Regions:
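Protein kinase catalytic-loop region centered on the HRD/HxD motif
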Residues: 99-109
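C-lobe/activation-segment region of protein kinase-like
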Residues: 128-167
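Flexible N-lobe loop architecture of eukaryotic-like protein kinase catalytic domains
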Residues: 47-50
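Conserved short submotifs of the Hanks-type protein kinase catalytic core
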Residues: 61-75
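AlphaC helix of the protein kinase catalytic domain
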Residues: 76-85
Length: 177
């Protein structure tokens, strides 16, 4: 397999245009190389425990890739398999992601694509927000998406969970000010 951008050695075969697990030959770190069309440069090297870190953005021929933290985990959609999540666990996940969103907002960055597809759960159960899908949006969009995430996790709206979601959203808003 050909080295990408003279730095990343693919560790597995992947279809053209798909993400590929690779080894950074400079650091010996395992990363995910994700093909991208655009990414906000401010996301590079933004470190937070609930954000998937983008270490580098590289060009290889006509293709552009984000070299991202390799996360041993899967998206919430895959984990849930169409079944709702326990209410307490749903609130914990939303609180973790709200904390990450607060970090983004404190830097003037808005994600705009917070869904069960862009939130990953690690093998240890930690929620991480994928930054590759971030779009240029507004604070209110992110906060609304946190509420929808809570609803999607539980399968329906419950007043007690709406309160937990509101608390997480409020915490995110306060932390970003």
């Amino acid at each position: 397999m050909a080295v990408i951008a003279n730095r990343y050695e693919p560790l597995e075969l992947a279809p053209a245009g798909a993400a590929v697990k690779a080894r950074d030959m400079q650091t010996a770190q395992t990363v995910m190389l994700r093909p991208i069309t655009r990414v906000d440069e401010r996301l590079r090297a933004l470190f937070h425990p609930s954000l998937v870190t983008i270490f580098d953005i590289v060009h290889d021929g006509a293709a552009t890739f984000a070299a991202c933290e390799f996360v041993q985990g899967r998206s919430l959609r895959l984990i849930m398999g169409g079944q709702p999540c326990n209410g307490r666990r749903a609130a914990e996940i939303v609180a973790e992601i709200a904390n990450a969103v607060a970090e983004l907002h404190s830097r003037g960055i808005y994600h705009g694509a917070i869904t069960i597809d862009t939130v990953l759960l690690t093998a240890k159960g930690k929620a991480k927000l994928d930054l590759v899908h971030a779009t240029d949006s507004a604070e209110s969009t992110d906060l609304d998406q946190l509420r929808v995430l809570l609803k999607d996790l539980t399968g329906y709206e419950r007043p007690d969970l709406a309160d937990a979601g509101s608390a997480a959203v409020l915490a995110a808003r306060l932390r970003s000010q």
